[in-house]
């Protein structure tokens, strides 16, 4: 059962009563009842949070052999900044500023880049006449909290998600891949997810790519999910997901590919929704696709760049 009043979403489940507000305040009220359903006790828990954003960034990027020899694919630059940064700026535009990066291959590159973030975005004076003094000018700060987690070199996508469970906790979270940008309205995506009250919602697009094929019903529920078998004009998985914490129970271990058994099972059980996006989406699996993104950025026509 769901009510919407004064921009507050009230959802009644078999567990706690949950209130969502547009500011990210979550109120959970657990009602303890008598056998006649009279209320004995009410336990209320209030959290003022925004959903955390999980970004998968541990892949090898084998199609970028020249660049990926020295860095993970999410650190390959579009313009002068890594594609990972572009993705984070997208989420930050909508007010989602706490990130969990699932690192793996050359994870130290990601950690070092964030450790030196001010060096990348500010003017620096190195004064060697006064004890190696470093002065940072016009510091450009982001409203971000970033946790980089080493989720293993050969861990599959599901395993990487499972490994960051302790950082997510028992709250819903956002998740996407570290090699694709999109101009999806993330606020509307989250609202869609809350309205349908399923465990998982993914963003789907129509594109001729080698990605997962979705069988989507008229009510936007996903009835089947097949990976790597696309025919022209069929909806595909673009990432940009909203996930409930129950999703962790669908992941067995490090060998679990999230796009295989977990998503197939979610679809079979009616727990996977599709948010249809008609706008821009582009992954970066090849040098040609990187060039597409580079050219859009140079021309000032990058649809994902809203900031």
Region spans (language model):
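Short, positively charged and aromatic/hydrophobic N-terminal segments
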Residues: 9, 18-20, 25, 32, ...
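N-terminal glycine-rich phosphate-binding loop and ensuing alpha1 helix
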Residues: 47-117, 148
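Structural beta-sheet core signal
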Residues: 53-55, 101, 175, 200-203, ...
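A structural signal for short hydrophobic beta-strand segments in well-ordered beta-sheet cores
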Residues: 75, 213-216, 263, 274
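Conserved beta-loop-beta/alpha segment of the NTase-like Rossmann-fold superfamily
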Residues: 110-218
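Catalytic-core segments of class I nucleotidyltransferases/pyrophosphorylases
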Residues: 172-174, 181, 185-194, 206-209, ...
């Amino acid at each position: 059962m769901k009510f919407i009043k004064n921009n507050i979403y009230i959802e009644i489940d078999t567990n706690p009563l949950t209130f969502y507000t547009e500011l990210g305040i979550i109120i959970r009220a657990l009602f303890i009842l008598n056998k006649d359903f009279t209320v004995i006790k009410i336990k209320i828990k209030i959290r003022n949070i925004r959903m955390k954003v999980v970004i998968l960034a541990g892949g090898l990027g084998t199609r970028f052999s020249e660049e990926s020899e020295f860095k993970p694919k999410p650190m390959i630059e579009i313009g002068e900044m890594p594609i990972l940064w572009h993705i984070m700026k997208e989420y930050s535009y909508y007010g989602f500023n706490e990130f969990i990066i699932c690192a793996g291959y050359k994870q130290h590159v990601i950690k070092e880049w964030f450790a030196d973030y001010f060096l990348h975005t500010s003017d620096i004076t190195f004064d060697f006449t006064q004890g190696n003094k470093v002065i940072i000018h016009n510091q450009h700060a982001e409203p971000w909290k970033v946790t980089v987690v080493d989720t293993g070199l050969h861990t599959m996508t599901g395993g990487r998600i499972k490994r960051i469970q302790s950082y997510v906790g028992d709250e819903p979270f956002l998740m996407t891949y570290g090699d694709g940008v999109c101009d999806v309205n993330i606020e509307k995506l989250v609202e869609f997810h809350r309205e349908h009250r399923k465990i998982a919602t993914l963003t789907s697009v129509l594109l001729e790519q080698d990605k997962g094929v979705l069988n989507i019903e008229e009510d936007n529920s996903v009835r089947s999910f097949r990976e790597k078998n696309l025919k022209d004009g069929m909806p595909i998985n673009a990432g940009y997901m909203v996930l409930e914490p129950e999703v962790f129970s669908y992941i067995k271990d490090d060998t679990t590919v999230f796009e295989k058994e977990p998503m197939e099972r979610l679809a079979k059980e009616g727990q996977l929704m599709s948010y249809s996006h008609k706008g821009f989406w582009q992954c970066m699996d090849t040098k040609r696709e990187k060039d597409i993104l580079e050219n859009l950025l140079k021309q000032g026509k990058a649809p994902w760049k809203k900031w």
